[in-house]
UniProtKB/Swiss-Prot annotation:
It comes from Roseobacter denitrificans (strain ATCC 33942 / OCh 114) (Erythrobacter sp. (strain OCh 114)). Keywords: Lyase, Metal-binding, Pyruvate. The active site is at residue 48. This is Hydroxypyruvate/pyruvate aldolase. A divalent metal cation binds at residues 152, 178.
């Protein structure tokens, strides 16, 4: 039995556009709820959210029966944490702050078993292989692993073409918040200069043949990103949905 099919990677390879939601609450219960909402993918954030290995595992278990594909953003691009996430059953990894082709190449190696990579071999006791029940997991896992890298500062932009040329990088995700800060517009992701830079970057990624991704909840920017060639777009955030809905209801009934 081979490794499970990565439906997210397959859909990207077939030219589909996929819409997702950013999950920062770090709870399996909310993950399970959003897994029934109809998003193509759900991002479990290990960088800016109070997640650890066990909470990420629990959210992945909660999404097991969902059609929404879990993407795991690791806190840093280190081999040890990527290995843990893959052994837990993650098939799509998002790595923040990728600045060079050399860094991207190391990340590719971290996601692959030897001889092509340096992922540690321990799948016999891992959730990814059904705790050893998927007998052909090792030889087939690499083909079902999807690596997404984040370009989110001036250095990454400067080296974008070289990063895009790295075999094994499946997509490049734009980080608007860090990118705007790096370009001197901290907290101004909707500044016209930042938006123009983002859209040009999305087009460069798309023109290279790689999948371009972004997080934005602004309808106009979502459409502009799609028009520029974005293929996986986070159009919602769990915290924002909860907070904004709560504020709206509270304000409605407290007006008097």
């Amino acid at each position: 039995m081979p490794a499970p099919l990565n439906t997210f990677k397959k859909s990207l390879s077939e030219g589909e556009t996929l819409f997702g939601c950013w999950m920062s609450i770090a709870e399996s219960y909310t993950a399970e709820i959003l897994g029934n909402a109809g998003f193509d993918w759900l991002l479990i954030d290990g960088e800016h959210s109070p997640n650890d290995v066990r909470s990420i595992r629990d959210q992945m278990i909660a999404l097991k029966s969902s059609d929404s594909h879990p993407i795991i953003r690791v806190p840093v691009g280190e081999t040890w944490i990527i290995k843990q996430m893959l052994d837990l059953g993650a098939q799509t990894i998002l790595v923040p702050m990728v600045e060079t082709a050399e860094q991207a190449q190391e990340l590719v190696r971290a996601c692959r078993y030897p001889p092509e990579g340096r992922r540690g071999v321990g799948y016999a006791v891992g959730r990814a292989s059904g705790f050893g029940q998927i007998d052909n997991y090792g030889p087939t896992a690499d083909a079902q692993t999807c690596l997404l890298v984040q370009v989110e500062n001036k250095t990454g932009l400067y080296n974008l073409d070289a990063i895009l040329a790295v075999d094994g990088v499946d997509g490049v995700f734009i980080g608007p918040a860090d990118l705007s800060a790096s370009l001197g517009y901290l907290g101004q992701t909707m500044h016209p200069d930042i938006q123009a830079t983002i859209l040009k970057t999305i087009k460069r990624i798309s023109d290279s043949g790689k999948a371009a991704g972004i997080l934005t909840t602004d309808d106009g920017m979502i459409q502009a990103s799609l028009d520029a060639g974005a293929r996986f777009v986070a159009v919602a955030m769990d915290i924002a949905m909860l907070l904004n809905t709560g504020k709206s209801i509270a304000a409605k009934w407290k007006q008097g």
